[in-house]
Amino acid sequence: MERVNAICRHALWRESVDEIARLEQDRAFCRHDRAHFLDVARLAYIENLERGLGVDKELIYAAALLHDIGRHLQYTQNIPHDEAGAQLAEIIMADCGFLPAERAEVTQAILQHRGDGDRSRDGLAALLYRADKASRMCLFCTAEPECNWSREKKNMTIRA
């Protein structure tokens, strides 16, 4: 997990996370912070283990730590956060020693994490999508009534 820890130490990652926090400080809805990134990583890894999918742990954690990293560029430059995040992830992962094929798999997962979410899919992109959605605890959110997520998409029960 040394390369994952290198992501967390990377100046571009830290600056991006700090800028997202600054821009979301008054946000009533779900935030895109370190806790969210780790929730997504852990949920994806649990599903990976439970289903025996064999997706590499480092790639799961890398994708989770990087999937929303482009949020600040969406807020400030109107660039879709998945596209901005994939570009930032490529730079960060290259600096942290990830191989080109690994970077491609993670950036593809980032680009697809807002997709249709076909729950029958396997692989990193599907794990990231499902964990990202499952990480949000709408049941306990005071902003839930104003949230634009559909009722079907909201997590109104605890599932295991």
Descriptions of predicted regions:
Residues 1-160:
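Metal-dependent phosphohydrolase cores
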